Amino acid sequence: MRNKVETRLKKCKKGGKTAIFLLVDSENFSTTSNVEKTARELLNACKNMKKLFPVILVGGSSATDQMGMDRAVRILRKKTKLPIVLFPGNITGVVPKAHAILFTSLMNSENPYYITQAQALGAPLVRKMKLEALPTAYLIIGEGTSAWFFGNARGIPFDKPKIAASYAMAAQYMGMRFVYLEAGSGAKQNVTPEMVQTVRSVFDGFLMVGGGIRSAKTA
């Protein structure tokens, strides 16, 4: 069956349900034992809440260690039946054995490389590895994080939800079915509920929000 992961995510979205994505940052795993330990901890934590965790993301905006990415994906595939979705920060984040990939365009980057050029370089790899591509508009919110720095982004101010909504509408009109609002790992502030609501009001696809979330209450 084609588009298995997207179909799975659509089922989560149906009825206005909210899902939590586990993100494994491969940069932190220099050895196989580190990955296996983390995999055990993650899977034990979510074994009773599988419906809340539809997929596992591997990567991150600053993840550049291709060998680490490959190691993490292979070990996670052995440990869980949950789909593994790549979240690459560059073409080095495209590795085999995953089920799908967030095929992102950093729409508010000032560097065309992150908008279309990296995608052109990575597309043949995605095809060769038979990864399910999830067309995603990646939007950096705020400034001062690794995602903002490495992506050379013109960060959308947290108090300007209509700007984010305009990008989301543009993404939808260009055929993208996913939007990711990213405050960035370690961000001092999370994406505001007002911005999420504003984007949701104009975007019909799958909306993801990350960065700066340190508690269940904030989430």
What are these regions (language model features)?
Residues 14-19, 26-84, 88-209, 213-219:
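Alpha/beta enzyme core
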